[in-house]
Protein backbone atom coordinates (compact mmCIF):
# COMPACT_ATOMS: atom_id res chain seq x y z
CA UNK A 1 0.00 0.00 0.00
CA UNK A 2 2.95 2.30 0.69
CA UNK A 3 4.20 1.71 -2.86
CA UNK A 4 0.74 2.62 -4.22
CA UNK A 5 0.77 5.94 -2.34
CA UNK A 6 4.29 6.68 -3.59
CA UNK A 7 3.23 6.06 -7.19
CA UNK A 8 0.12 8.17 -6.71
CA UNK A 9 2.11 11.11 -5.28
CA UNK A 10 4.66 10.76 -8.06
CA UNK A 11 1.83 10.79 -10.63
CA UNK A 12 0.26 13.89 -9.04
CA UNK A 13 3.55 15.79 -9.19
CA UNK A 14 4.12 14.75 -12.80
CA UNK A 15 0.60 15.89 -13.75
CA UNK A 16 1.06 19.24 -11.99
CA UNK A 17 4.34 19.72 -13.88
CA UNK A 18 2.64 18.94 -17.19
CA UNK A 19 4.37 15.55 -17.68
CA UNK A 20 1.15 13.76 -18.59
CA UNK A 21 2.68 10.53 -19.94
CA UNK A 22 4.76 10.06 -16.77
CA UNK A 23 1.64 10.69 -14.67
CA UNK A 24 -0.34 8.11 -16.65
CA UNK A 25 2.41 5.55 -16.22
CA UNK A 26 2.52 6.10 -12.46
CA UNK A 27 -1.25 5.85 -12.06
CA UNK A 28 -1.42 2.72 -14.24
CA UNK A 29 1.31 0.99 -12.21
CA UNK A 30 -0.49 1.92 -9.00
CA UNK A 31 -3.77 0.53 -10.37
CA UNK A 32 -2.07 -2.81 -11.11
CA UNK A 33 -1.08 -2.98 -7.44
CA UNK A 34 -4.45 -1.74 -6.12
CA UNK A 35 -7.17 -2.28 -8.81
CA UNK A 36 -10.02 -1.32 -6.45
CA UNK A 37 -8.71 2.14 -5.53
CA UNK A 38 -11.27 4.61 -6.91
CA UNK A 39 -9.00 7.65 -6.40
CA UNK A 40 -6.40 6.20 -8.79
CA UNK A 41 -8.96 5.82 -11.57
CA UNK A 42 -10.24 9.34 -10.89
CA UNK A 43 -6.72 10.78 -11.13
CA UNK A 44 -5.94 8.83 -14.29
CA UNK A 45 -9.22 10.05 -15.80
CA UNK A 46 -8.06 13.63 -15.17
CA UNK A 47 -4.70 12.86 -16.80
CA UNK A 48 -6.34 11.33 -19.88
CA UNK A 49 -8.62 14.38 -20.16
CA UNK A 50 -5.63 16.70 -20.00
CA UNK A 51 -3.93 14.66 -22.72
CA UNK A 52 -7.05 14.88 -24.89
CA UNK A 53 -7.85 11.16 -24.81
CA UNK A 54 -11.45 11.73 -23.74
CA UNK A 55 -12.69 8.19 -24.45
CA UNK A 56 -10.21 6.73 -21.95
CA UNK A 57 -11.00 9.55 -19.53
CA UNK A 58 -14.65 8.51 -19.81
CA UNK A 59 -13.84 4.82 -19.22
CA UNK A 60 -11.86 5.64 -16.07
CA UNK A 61 -14.67 7.94 -14.93
CA UNK A 62 -17.12 5.04 -15.31
CA UNK A 63 -14.79 2.77 -13.33
CA UNK A 64 -14.53 5.37 -10.57
CA UNK A 65 -18.34 5.50 -10.27
CA UNK A 66 -18.54 1.71 -10.33
CA UNK A 67 -16.03 1.37 -7.46
CA UNK A 68 -17.48 4.19 -5.33
CA UNK A 69 -21.02 5.10 -6.47
CA UNK A 70 -21.58 7.56 -3.60
CA UNK A 71 -18.54 9.75 -4.42
CA UNK A 72 -19.45 12.92 -6.32
CA UNK A 73 -16.00 13.37 -7.84
CA UNK A 74 -16.44 10.16 -9.87
CA UNK A 75 -19.59 11.50 -11.51
CA UNK A 76 -17.83 14.81 -12.14
CA UNK A 77 -14.98 12.98 -13.94
CA UNK A 78 -17.37 10.90 -16.03
CA UNK A 79 -19.56 13.88 -16.96
CA UNK A 80 -16.56 16.06 -17.88
CA UNK A 81 -15.33 13.38 -20.30
CA UNK A 82 -18.81 13.09 -21.82
CA UNK A 83 -18.87 16.85 -22.27
CA UNK A 84 -15.56 16.73 -24.14
CA UNK A 85 -17.05 13.99 -26.34
CA UNK A 86 -20.02 16.31 -27.09
CA UNK A 87 -22.42 13.83 -25.47
CA UNK A 88 -24.21 16.60 -23.61
CA UNK A 89 -27.45 14.77 -22.76
CA UNK A 90 -25.50 11.92 -21.13
CA UNK A 91 -23.29 14.43 -19.30
CA UNK A 92 -26.39 16.17 -17.94
CA UNK A 93 -27.83 12.86 -16.71
CA UNK A 94 -24.50 11.99 -15.06
CA UNK A 95 -24.40 15.30 -13.17
CA UNK A 96 -28.00 14.70 -12.04
CA UNK A 97 -27.13 11.17 -10.88
CA UNK A 98 -24.16 12.51 -8.93
CA UNK A 99 -26.32 15.11 -7.19
CA UNK A 100 -28.58 12.33 -5.92
CA UNK A 101 -25.61 11.15 -3.85
CA UNK A 102 -24.05 14.55 -3.04
CA UNK A 103 -26.83 17.12 -3.29
CA UNK A 104 -24.62 20.05 -2.23
CA UNK A 105 -21.56 19.29 -4.36
CA UNK A 106 -20.72 22.67 -6.00
CA UNK A 107 -18.83 21.12 -8.95
CA UNK A 108 -21.77 18.91 -9.84
CA UNK A 109 -24.19 21.82 -9.49
CA UNK A 110 -22.12 24.09 -11.72
CA UNK A 111 -21.57 21.29 -14.23
CA UNK A 112 -25.31 20.67 -14.45
CA UNK A 113 -26.03 24.38 -14.96
CA UNK A 114 -23.46 24.56 -17.75
CA UNK A 115 -24.87 21.49 -19.45
CA UNK A 116 -28.39 22.90 -19.31
CA UNK A 117 -27.07 26.13 -20.83
CA UNK A 118 -25.25 24.26 -23.60
CA UNK A 119 -28.33 22.19 -24.40
CA UNK A 120 -30.52 25.30 -24.39
CA UNK A 121 -28.04 26.95 -26.74
CA UNK A 122 -28.23 23.97 -29.11
CA UNK A 123 -32.02 24.22 -29.23
CA UNK A 124 -31.77 27.94 -29.84
CA UNK A 125 -29.45 27.34 -32.81
CA UNK A 126 -31.83 24.80 -34.41
CA UNK A 127 -34.93 26.70 -35.59
CA UNK A 128 -36.77 23.41 -36.10
CA UNK A 129 -36.43 22.64 -32.37
CA UNK A 130 -38.39 25.63 -31.05
CA UNK A 131 -41.17 24.61 -28.60
CA UNK A 132 -43.98 26.36 -30.52
CA UNK A 133 -42.82 25.10 -33.94
CA UNK A 134 -46.13 23.82 -35.30
CA UNK A 135 -48.09 26.70 -33.80
CA UNK A 136 -45.86 29.14 -35.68
CA UNK A 137 -46.15 27.19 -38.94
CA UNK A 138 -49.95 26.96 -38.53
CA UNK A 139 -50.27 30.72 -38.00
CA UNK A 140 -48.49 31.66 -41.25
CA UNK A 141 -50.41 31.22 -44.53
CA UNK A 142 -47.22 30.26 -46.37
CA UNK A 143 -46.77 27.08 -44.33
CA UNK A 144 -50.30 26.37 -43.07
CA UNK A 145 -51.31 24.50 -46.24
CA UNK A 146 -48.05 22.51 -46.25
CA UNK A 147 -48.90 20.95 -42.89
CA UNK A 148 -51.61 18.83 -44.50
CA UNK A 149 -48.88 16.97 -46.43
CA UNK A 150 -47.55 14.00 -44.37
CA UNK A 151 -44.22 14.09 -46.24
CA UNK A 152 -43.71 17.69 -45.16
CA UNK A 153 -44.34 16.88 -41.49
CA UNK A 154 -41.96 13.92 -41.79
CA UNK A 155 -39.29 16.25 -43.22
CA UNK A 156 -39.77 18.75 -40.39
CA UNK A 157 -39.42 16.02 -37.76
CA UNK A 158 -36.26 14.77 -39.48
CA UNK A 159 -34.68 18.23 -39.28
CA UNK A 160 -35.95 18.67 -35.74
CA UNK A 161 -34.08 15.57 -34.61
CA UNK A 162 -31.08 15.89 -36.95
CA UNK A 163 -30.38 19.54 -37.85
CA UNK A 164 -27.12 18.53 -39.57
CA UNK A 165 -29.25 17.33 -42.53
CA UNK A 166 -30.40 20.89 -43.26
CA UNK A 167 -27.66 21.53 -45.84
CA UNK A 168 -28.93 18.66 -48.01
CA UNK A 169 -32.56 19.86 -47.83
CA UNK A 170 -32.17 23.53 -48.80
CA UNK A 171 -33.00 22.82 -52.45
CA UNK A 172 -36.52 21.90 -51.35
CA UNK A 173 -38.55 25.13 -51.73
CA UNK A 174 -40.75 24.05 -48.81
CA UNK A 175 -37.75 24.15 -46.48
CA UNK A 176 -36.72 27.62 -47.71
CA UNK A 177 -40.29 28.83 -47.09
CA UNK A 178 -40.30 27.23 -43.64
CA UNK A 179 -36.99 28.88 -42.71
CA UNK A 180 -38.40 32.24 -43.84
CA UNK A 181 -41.33 31.79 -41.45
CA UNK A 182 -39.29 30.50 -38.49
CA UNK A 183 -36.48 33.06 -38.78
CA UNK A 184 -38.67 35.99 -39.77
CA UNK A 185 -36.50 36.62 -42.86
CA UNK A 186 -37.62 36.73 -46.48
CA UNK A 187 -35.06 34.29 -47.88
CA UNK A 188 -36.73 34.32 -51.27
CA UNK A 189 -36.00 38.02 -51.86
CA UNK A 190 -32.21 37.76 -51.71
CA UNK A 191 -30.06 38.84 -54.65
CA UNK A 192 -29.23 36.20 -57.23
CA UNK A 193 -25.68 35.92 -55.94
CA UNK A 194 -27.08 34.97 -52.55
CA UNK A 195 -29.64 32.43 -53.68
CA UNK A 196 -27.16 29.55 -53.60
CA UNK A 197 -27.10 28.42 -50.01
CA UNK A 198 -23.58 28.56 -48.63
CA UNK A 199 -22.67 25.81 -46.21
CA UNK A 200 -22.39 26.89 -42.59
CA UNK A 201 -18.85 27.75 -41.49
CA UNK A 202 -17.00 24.92 -39.76
CA UNK A 203 -17.26 25.09 -35.98
CA UNK A 204 -14.23 26.66 -34.28
CA UNK A 205 -11.75 24.15 -32.89
CA UNK A 206 -12.75 23.11 -29.41
CA UNK A 207 -10.66 24.79 -26.78
CA UNK A 208 -8.82 22.44 -24.51
CA UNK A 209 -10.21 22.65 -21.02
CA UNK A 210 -8.09 22.15 -17.98
CA UNK A 211 -9.36 19.20 -15.92
CA UNK A 212 -10.46 19.79 -12.37
CA UNK A 213 -7.81 19.44 -9.66
CA UNK A 214 -8.04 16.33 -7.50
CA UNK A 215 -9.47 17.47 -4.17
CA UNK A 216 -8.10 14.57 -2.17
CA UNK A 217 -4.61 15.02 -3.61
CA UNK A 218 -4.25 18.81 -3.73
CA UNK A 219 -0.95 20.30 -2.55
CA UNK A 220 -1.17 21.96 0.83
CA UNK A 221 -0.96 25.48 -0.62
CA UNK A 222 -4.00 24.85 -2.86
CA UNK A 223 -5.98 23.38 0.03
CA UNK A 224 -5.25 26.44 2.13
CA UNK A 225 -6.16 28.70 -0.80
CA UNK A 226 -9.56 27.01 -1.09
CA UNK A 227 -10.17 27.54 2.63
CA UNK A 228 -9.31 31.23 2.29
CA UNK A 229 -11.66 31.46 -0.68
CA UNK A 230 -14.53 29.98 1.35
CA UNK A 231 -13.86 32.48 4.14
CA UNK A 232 -13.88 35.24 1.55
CA UNK A 233 -17.17 33.98 0.12
CA UNK A 234 -18.76 34.02 3.58
CA UNK A 235 -17.63 37.61 4.13
CA UNK A 236 -18.81 38.60 0.64
CA UNK A 237 -22.30 37.25 1.34
CA UNK A 238 -22.39 39.37 4.50
CA UNK A 239 -21.24 42.39 2.43
CA UNK A 240 -18.10 42.62 4.56
CA UNK A 241 -16.09 43.50 1.48
CA UNK A 242 -12.82 44.50 3.17
CA UNK A 243 -12.60 41.14 4.94
CA UNK A 244 -13.53 39.32 1.73
CA UNK A 245 -10.73 41.08 -0.16
CA UNK A 246 -8.18 40.06 2.49
CA UNK A 247 -9.13 36.39 2.22
CA UNK A 248 -9.19 36.43 -1.59
CA UNK A 249 -5.80 38.16 -1.61
CA UNK A 250 -4.41 35.49 0.71
CA UNK A 251 -5.86 32.75 -1.53
CA UNK A 252 -4.21 34.40 -4.55
CA UNK A 253 -0.84 34.46 -2.76
CA UNK A 254 -1.16 30.77 -1.89
CA UNK A 255 -2.22 29.74 -5.42
CA UNK A 256 -1.27 32.42 -7.98
CA UNK A 257 -2.20 30.14 -10.92
CA UNK A 258 -5.93 30.12 -10.11
CA UNK A 259 -7.79 32.98 -11.82
CA UNK A 260 -10.93 32.43 -9.71
CA UNK A 261 -9.46 34.24 -6.71
CA UNK A 262 -8.77 37.30 -8.87
CA UNK A 263 -12.26 37.31 -10.40
CA UNK A 264 -13.67 37.05 -6.88
CA UNK A 265 -11.76 40.20 -5.98
CA UNK A 266 -13.18 41.83 -9.11
CA UNK A 267 -16.68 40.89 -7.94
CA UNK A 268 -16.07 42.73 -4.67
CA UNK A 269 -14.97 45.90 -6.44
CA UNK A 270 -18.00 45.58 -8.73
CA UNK A 271 -20.28 45.58 -5.68
CA UNK A 272 -18.39 48.56 -4.24
CA UNK A 273 -18.94 50.47 -7.49
CA UNK A 274 -15.23 50.71 -8.34
CA UNK A 275 -15.70 49.56 -11.92
CA UNK A 276 -12.23 50.56 -13.15
CA UNK A 277 -10.59 48.35 -10.51
CA UNK A 278 -13.08 45.58 -11.31
CA UNK A 279 -12.11 45.67 -14.99
CA UNK A 280 -8.40 45.81 -14.20
CA UNK A 281 -8.67 42.65 -12.08
CA UNK A 282 -10.79 40.85 -14.68
CA UNK A 283 -8.18 41.55 -17.36
CA UNK A 284 -5.48 40.26 -15.02
CA UNK A 285 -7.56 37.14 -14.27
CA UNK A 286 -7.96 36.46 -17.99
CA UNK A 287 -4.19 36.68 -18.49
CA UNK A 288 -3.60 34.25 -15.60
CA UNK A 289 -6.29 31.94 -16.99
CA UNK A 290 -4.78 31.94 -20.47
CA UNK A 291 -1.31 31.18 -19.09
CA UNK A 292 -2.62 28.23 -17.10
CA UNK A 293 -5.04 26.91 -19.75
CA UNK A 294 -8.05 27.66 -17.58
CA UNK A 295 -11.55 26.44 -18.44
CA UNK A 296 -13.03 28.65 -21.21
CA UNK A 297 -16.15 29.09 -19.08
CA UNK A 298 -14.12 30.92 -16.43
CA UNK A 299 -12.62 33.19 -19.10
CA UNK A 300 -16.15 33.88 -20.37
CA UNK A 301 -17.31 34.85 -16.86
CA UNK A 302 -14.48 37.38 -16.53
CA UNK A 303 -15.36 38.98 -19.87
CA UNK A 304 -19.04 39.07 -18.88
CA UNK A 305 -18.18 40.86 -15.63
CA UNK A 306 -16.28 43.52 -17.60
CA UNK A 307 -19.38 43.87 -19.78
CA UNK A 308 -21.57 44.22 -16.70
CA UNK A 309 -19.33 46.96 -15.31
CA UNK A 310 -19.68 48.98 -18.50
CA UNK A 311 -23.43 48.32 -18.52
CA UNK A 312 -23.66 49.78 -15.00
CA UNK A 313 -21.88 52.90 -16.26
CA UNK A 314 -24.29 53.05 -19.23
CA UNK A 315 -21.38 52.62 -21.65
CA UNK A 316 -23.35 50.23 -23.78
CA UNK A 317 -21.01 50.07 -26.77
CA UNK A 318 -18.14 48.87 -24.56
CA UNK A 319 -20.51 46.51 -22.74
CA UNK A 320 -21.57 44.91 -26.04
CA UNK A 321 -17.92 44.48 -27.06
CA UNK A 322 -17.08 42.48 -23.92
CA UNK A 323 -20.36 40.55 -23.89
CA UNK A 324 -19.50 39.36 -27.39
CA UNK A 325 -16.03 38.35 -26.20
CA UNK A 326 -17.67 36.35 -23.42
CA UNK A 327 -20.07 34.70 -25.85
CA UNK A 328 -17.17 33.80 -28.14
CA UNK A 329 -15.64 31.84 -25.24
CA UNK A 330 -18.87 30.24 -24.03
CA UNK A 331 -22.47 31.08 -24.87
CA UNK A 332 -24.89 31.31 -21.96
CA UNK A 333 -28.51 32.53 -22.10
CA UNK A 334 -27.92 35.17 -19.39
CA UNK A 335 -25.02 36.88 -21.16
CA UNK A 336 -26.80 36.65 -24.52
CA UNK A 337 -29.89 38.30 -23.03
CA UNK A 338 -27.79 41.04 -21.43
CA UNK A 339 -25.98 41.69 -24.72
CA UNK A 340 -29.27 41.95 -26.61
CA UNK A 341 -30.59 44.34 -23.95
CA UNK A 342 -27.51 46.56 -24.33
CA UNK A 343 -27.84 46.49 -28.13
CA UNK A 344 -31.48 47.53 -27.89
CA UNK A 345 -30.69 50.44 -25.56
CA UNK A 346 -27.76 51.56 -27.73
CA UNK A 347 -29.87 51.45 -30.88
CA UNK A 348 -32.55 53.57 -29.22
CA UNK A 349 -29.96 56.05 -27.95
CA UNK A 350 -28.50 56.39 -31.44
CA UNK A 351 -31.97 56.88 -32.89
CA UNK A 352 -32.80 59.61 -30.39
CA UNK A 353 -29.42 61.28 -30.86
CA UNK A 354 -30.10 61.43 -34.60
CA UNK A 355 -33.32 63.44 -34.15
CA UNK A 356 -32.94 67.06 -35.28
CA UNK A 357 -36.08 68.97 -36.36
CA UNK A 358 -34.04 71.68 -38.12
CA UNK A 359 -32.24 69.16 -40.32
CA UNK A 360 -35.57 67.38 -40.87
CA UNK A 361 -37.03 70.61 -42.24
CA UNK A 362 -34.08 70.99 -44.63
CA UNK A 363 -34.60 67.46 -45.94
CA UNK A 364 -38.34 68.05 -46.26
CA UNK A 365 -37.74 71.17 -48.38
CA UNK A 366 -35.31 69.26 -50.60
CA UNK A 367 -37.93 66.53 -50.96
CA UNK A 368 -40.58 69.09 -51.94
CA UNK A 369 -38.29 70.50 -54.64
CA UNK A 370 -37.64 67.05 -56.10
CA UNK A 371 -41.35 66.23 -55.96
CA UNK A 372 -42.21 69.39 -57.91
CA UNK A 373 -39.67 68.39 -60.57
CA UNK A 374 -41.18 64.90 -60.82
CA UNK A 375 -38.08 63.21 -59.37
CA UNK A 376 -40.10 61.00 -57.02
CA UNK A 377 -37.37 58.47 -56.06
CA UNK A 378 -35.06 61.29 -54.93
CA UNK A 379 -37.92 63.04 -53.15
CA UNK A 380 -38.70 59.81 -51.30
CA UNK A 381 -35.06 59.58 -50.10
CA UNK A 382 -35.19 63.11 -48.70
CA UNK A 383 -38.53 62.47 -46.96
CA UNK A 384 -37.16 59.23 -45.48
CA UNK A 385 -34.14 61.09 -44.09
CA UNK A 386 -36.46 63.79 -42.73
CA UNK A 387 -38.54 61.11 -40.94
CA UNK A 388 -35.39 59.73 -39.29
CA UNK A 389 -34.55 63.25 -38.12
CA UNK A 390 -38.08 63.95 -36.86
CA UNK A 391 -40.19 60.76 -36.63
CA UNK A 392 -43.12 62.51 -34.89
CA UNK A 393 -43.94 64.88 -37.78
CA UNK A 394 -47.11 63.48 -39.41
CA UNK A 395 -46.75 65.65 -42.53
CA UNK A 396 -43.49 63.92 -43.48
CA UNK A 397 -45.27 60.56 -43.69
CA UNK A 398 -48.01 62.17 -45.76
CA UNK A 399 -45.44 63.58 -48.20
CA UNK A 400 -43.65 60.27 -48.55
CA UNK A 401 -47.00 58.53 -49.10
CA UNK A 402 -47.58 60.88 -52.04
CA UNK A 403 -44.22 59.75 -53.49
CA UNK A 404 -45.10 56.09 -53.05
CA UNK A 405 -48.43 56.65 -54.80
CA UNK A 406 -46.66 58.30 -57.75
CA UNK A 407 -44.29 55.32 -57.89
CA UNK A 408 -47.30 52.91 -57.78
CA UNK A 409 -46.16 51.49 -54.41
CA UNK A 410 -49.67 51.63 -52.98
CA UNK A 411 -49.17 49.30 -50.01
CA UNK A 412 -46.24 51.41 -48.79
CA UNK A 413 -48.31 54.55 -49.33
CA UNK A 414 -51.10 53.09 -47.18
CA UNK A 415 -48.63 52.24 -44.43
CA UNK A 416 -47.32 55.81 -44.33
CA UNK A 417 -50.85 57.22 -44.34
CA UNK A 418 -51.75 55.04 -41.36
CA UNK A 419 -48.70 56.36 -39.48
CA UNK A 420 -49.64 59.92 -40.41
CA UNK A 421 -53.22 59.49 -39.18
CA UNK A 422 -52.05 57.86 -35.95
CA UNK A 423 -49.71 60.79 -35.23
CA UNK A 424 -52.23 63.49 -36.18
CA UNK A 425 -55.83 62.17 -36.43
CA UNK A 426 -57.20 65.57 -37.58
CA UNK A 427 -54.77 66.02 -40.50
CA UNK A 428 -57.09 65.66 -43.51
CA UNK A 429 -54.36 65.04 -46.10
CA UNK A 430 -53.53 61.79 -44.32
CA UNK A 431 -57.07 60.57 -45.10
CA UNK A 432 -57.29 61.90 -48.67
CA UNK A 433 -53.93 60.38 -49.61
CA UNK A 434 -54.91 57.06 -48.08
CA UNK A 435 -58.20 57.13 -49.99
CA UNK A 436 -56.36 58.03 -53.21
CA UNK A 437 -54.11 54.99 -52.82
CA UNK A 438 -57.12 52.74 -52.24
CA UNK A 439 -58.86 54.28 -55.24
CA UNK A 440 -55.82 53.58 -57.41
CA UNK A 441 -55.97 49.97 -56.21
CA UNK A 442 -59.66 49.93 -57.29
CA UNK A 443 -60.73 49.18 -53.73
CA UNK A 444 -63.59 51.66 -54.07
CA UNK A 445 -65.57 50.58 -51.01
CA UNK A 446 -62.66 51.21 -48.64
CA UNK A 447 -61.70 54.39 -50.47
CA UNK A 448 -65.24 55.79 -49.99
CA UNK A 449 -65.06 55.01 -46.26
CA UNK A 450 -61.82 56.97 -45.93
CA UNK A 451 -63.06 59.89 -48.06
CA UNK A 452 -66.10 59.99 -45.78
CA UNK A 453 -63.85 60.25 -42.71
CA UNK A 454 -62.12 63.23 -44.34
CA UNK A 455 -65.53 64.84 -44.99
CA UNK A 456 -66.51 64.24 -41.37
CA UNK A 457 -63.52 66.37 -40.39
CA UNK A 458 -64.19 69.04 -43.03
CA UNK A 459 -67.45 68.79 -45.00
CA UNK A 460 -66.32 71.51 -47.42
CA UNK A 461 -63.20 69.62 -48.49
CA UNK A 462 -63.62 69.47 -52.30
CA UNK A 463 -60.82 66.91 -52.76
CA UNK A 464 -62.62 64.45 -50.49
CA UNK A 465 -66.08 65.11 -51.95
CA UNK A 466 -64.82 64.65 -55.53
CA UNK A 467 -63.00 61.46 -54.58
CA UNK A 468 -66.10 60.05 -52.94
CA UNK A 469 -68.17 60.77 -56.07
CA UNK A 470 -65.56 59.19 -58.36
CA UNK A 471 -65.42 56.01 -56.30
CA UNK A 472 -69.21 55.75 -56.14
CA UNK A 473 -69.50 56.07 -59.94
CA UNK A 474 -66.63 53.66 -60.54
CA UNK A 475 -68.24 51.10 -58.25
CA UNK A 476 -71.58 51.50 -60.02
CA UNK A 477 -70.08 51.19 -63.51
CA UNK A 478 -67.71 48.38 -62.70
CA UNK A 479 -67.94 45.44 -65.10
CA UNK A 480 -64.88 43.46 -64.18
CA UNK A 481 -64.50 39.88 -65.31
CA UNK A 482 -64.45 37.28 -62.54
CA UNK A 483 -60.73 36.75 -63.26
CA UNK A 484 -59.99 40.46 -62.75
CA UNK A 485 -61.97 40.52 -59.52
CA UNK A 486 -60.15 37.48 -58.19
CA UNK A 487 -56.72 38.76 -59.24
CA UNK A 488 -57.28 42.15 -57.63
CA UNK A 489 -58.73 40.63 -54.45
CA UNK A 490 -55.90 38.15 -54.02
CA UNK A 491 -53.39 41.00 -54.10
CA UNK A 492 -54.79 42.07 -50.73
CA UNK A 493 -52.81 40.42 -47.88
CA UNK A 494 -55.93 40.28 -45.71
CA UNK A 495 -57.82 38.38 -48.41
CA UNK A 496 -54.86 36.04 -48.89
CA UNK A 497 -54.93 35.19 -45.21
CA UNK A 498 -58.68 34.58 -45.21
CA UNK A 499 -58.58 32.35 -48.29
CA UNK A 500 -55.65 30.30 -46.99
CA UNK A 501 -57.48 29.55 -43.73
CA UNK A 502 -58.76 25.93 -43.97
CA UNK A 503 -61.66 26.70 -41.62
CA UNK A 504 -62.85 29.62 -43.78
CA UNK A 505 -62.58 27.57 -46.96
CA UNK A 506 -64.74 24.90 -45.35
CA UNK A 507 -67.31 27.55 -44.36
CA UNK A 508 -67.41 28.93 -47.92
CA UNK A 509 -67.98 25.42 -49.30
CA UNK A 510 -70.85 24.93 -46.84
CA UNK A 511 -72.39 28.24 -47.93
CA UNK A 512 -72.34 27.09 -51.57
CA UNK A 513 -74.02 23.79 -50.77
CA UNK A 514 -76.36 25.10 -48.09
CA UNK A 515 -77.14 28.86 -48.18
CA UNK A 516 -79.04 28.48 -44.89
CA UNK A 517 -75.71 27.78 -43.14
CA UNK A 518 -74.75 31.44 -43.69
CA UNK A 519 -77.05 32.72 -40.93
CA UNK A 520 -75.38 30.44 -38.38
CA UNK A 521 -71.87 31.50 -39.40
CA UNK A 522 -72.77 35.19 -39.28
CA UNK A 523 -73.50 34.84 -35.56
CA UNK A 524 -69.75 34.58 -35.05
CA UNK A 525 -68.44 38.20 -35.27
CA UNK A 526 -64.97 37.11 -36.43
CA UNK A 527 -66.35 35.01 -39.29
CA UNK A 528 -68.91 37.70 -40.14
CA UNK A 529 -66.10 40.23 -40.49
CA UNK A 530 -64.16 37.94 -42.83
CA UNK A 531 -67.24 37.26 -44.97
CA UNK A 532 -67.91 41.01 -45.18
CA UNK A 533 -64.33 41.53 -46.38
CA UNK A 534 -64.78 38.95 -49.15
CA UNK A 535 -68.04 40.65 -50.16
CA UNK A 536 -66.36 44.07 -50.24
CA UNK A 537 -63.68 42.90 -52.67
CA UNK A 538 -66.26 41.14 -54.84
CA UNK A 539 -65.11 37.56 -54.28
CA UNK A 540 -68.52 36.46 -52.99
CA UNK A 541 -72.04 37.79 -53.32
CA UNK A 542 -75.09 37.04 -51.18
CA UNK A 543 -78.50 37.08 -52.78
From Swiss-Prot:
Record-listed cross-link Glycyl lysine isopeptide (Lys-Gly) (interchain with G-Cter in SUMO2), residues = 123, 210
Composition bias type Basic and acidic residues, residue spans: 205-233
PTM annotation (Phosphotyrosine): residues: 354
Under SUPFAM superfamilies, the record lists: TPR-like
Q: Does the record carry tRNA processing as a key word?
A: no
Q: Which residues carry this modification: Phosphothreonine?
A: 198, 332
Q: How does it assemble?
A: Probably forms a complex composed of chaperones HSP90 and HSP70, co-chaperones STIP1/HOP, CDC37, PPP5C, PTGES3/p23, TSC1 and client protein TSC2. Forms a complex with HSPA8/HSC70, HSPCA/HSP-86 and HSPCB/HSP-84. Interacts with PACRG. Interacts with EEF1AKMT3. Interacts with HSP90/HSP90AA1; the interaction dissociates the PPP5C:HSP90AA1 interaction. Interacts with FLCN, FNIP1 and FNIP2. Interacts with HSPA8/HSC70. Interacts with HSP90AB1; upon SMYD2-dependent HSP90AB1 methylation.
What name appears for this protein in its UniProt entry? Stress-induced-phosphoprotein 1
Question: What is the species listed in this Swiss-Prot or TrEMBL entry?
Answer: Macaca fascicularis
Q: What is the lineage of its organism?
A: Eukaryota, Metazoa, Chordata, Craniata, Vertebrata
Q: Which gene encodes it?
A: STIP1
Amino acid sequence: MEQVNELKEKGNKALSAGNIDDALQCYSEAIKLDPHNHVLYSNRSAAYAKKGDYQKAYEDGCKTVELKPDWGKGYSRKAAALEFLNRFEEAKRTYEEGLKHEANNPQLKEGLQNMEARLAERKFMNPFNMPNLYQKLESDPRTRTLLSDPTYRELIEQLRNKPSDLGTKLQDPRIMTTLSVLLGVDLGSMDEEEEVATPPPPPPPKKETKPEPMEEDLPENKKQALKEKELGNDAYKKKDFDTALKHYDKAKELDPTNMTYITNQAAVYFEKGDYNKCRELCEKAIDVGRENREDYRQIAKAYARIGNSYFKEEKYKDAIHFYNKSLAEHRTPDVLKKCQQAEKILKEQERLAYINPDLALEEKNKGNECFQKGDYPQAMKHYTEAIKRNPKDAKLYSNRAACYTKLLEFQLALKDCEECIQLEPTFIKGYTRKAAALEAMKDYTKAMDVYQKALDLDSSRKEAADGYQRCMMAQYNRHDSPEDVKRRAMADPEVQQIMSDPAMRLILEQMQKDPQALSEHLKNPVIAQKIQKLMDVGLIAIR
